[in-house]
Amino acid sequence: VMQLGFPAEYVEQVDLPFETAGAVRFPNQAQFHPLKFVAAIAKNLNIYEHSPVREMTEYFALTDHGSVAAEKVIVATHFPFINRRGSYFVKLYQERSYVLSLKNTEIPDGIYLEAKKGGLSLRGYEDTLLLGGITHRTGKEPDGFEKLREQAKLYFPEAEITGQWAAQDCMTLDGLPYIGNYSSSTPDLFVAGGFGKWGMTGAMISAIVLSDLCREGKMNLQPFLIRREVF
């Protein structure tokens, strides 16, 4: 990590209720609040609700209430829904993961993410601990919530479970998001998707890449090219 230019250190003692071999610690980090972030951005935007796009062309979005025309169009719909171009239905697969909110328990100091695939994540918010984990291909694991509840009872036996959520993420074939032109035949239609478990990070990278493409016609972050080699 340090060779990539990020300040980090290896620590052996961590504030967790289970044993670890150690952890990579990143200093001077902040805890991100996505709703406050979105609310601040939305102040300068016009957001049209209850207007699902029924059909899409390169320059038009057609809805039940009318059409919207634009010189540049970005499809940022979690899953790219235009199938006749791009063929994203064969370039993406779905994964599901789970989160529980716990109260009446000690909240670890910091934000933690287990390195192994499907491992646990922990972060606090006020008097609540958010415990996430149990990742699997969608449709392959019928009792993901129950398995996460078992982990909660094991590591936080006194905690009260006050809420639960499931997330479904679009995964790419190589782990990097698809950002750029929707297809080779659509110079003014763009896409951002396949963020995996890193939606906020992927969204910020997409904003940088697509703003450059729309304004300057060039892409400065080549690894995210959609027509890249993935095997």
Describe these PLM feature segments.
Residues V1-V11:
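Dinucleotide-binding Rossmann-like beta1-alpha1 core, especially the glycine-rich loop
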Residues Q3-L4, A21-K72, A76:
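Helical element adjacent to the flavin cofactor pocket in flavoenzyme catalytic cores
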Residues E9-E12, I47-E49, T63, V75, ...:
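General beta-strand structural signal in soluble alpha/beta enzymes
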Residues E12-F18:
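Flexible hinge/switch segments at interdomain interfaces of large molecular machines
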Residues A30-Q31, R54, V75, F79-F81, ...:
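Short, glycine-/Ser/Thr-/acidic-enriched flexible segments
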Residues M56-G124:
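Flavin-dependent oxidoreductases
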Residues K116-K117, E126, F145-E150, L154-F231:
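C-terminal catalytic lobe of FAD-dependent flavoproteins
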Residues Y125-E126, L130-I134:
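Long, K/E/R/D-enriched contiguous segments that form extended
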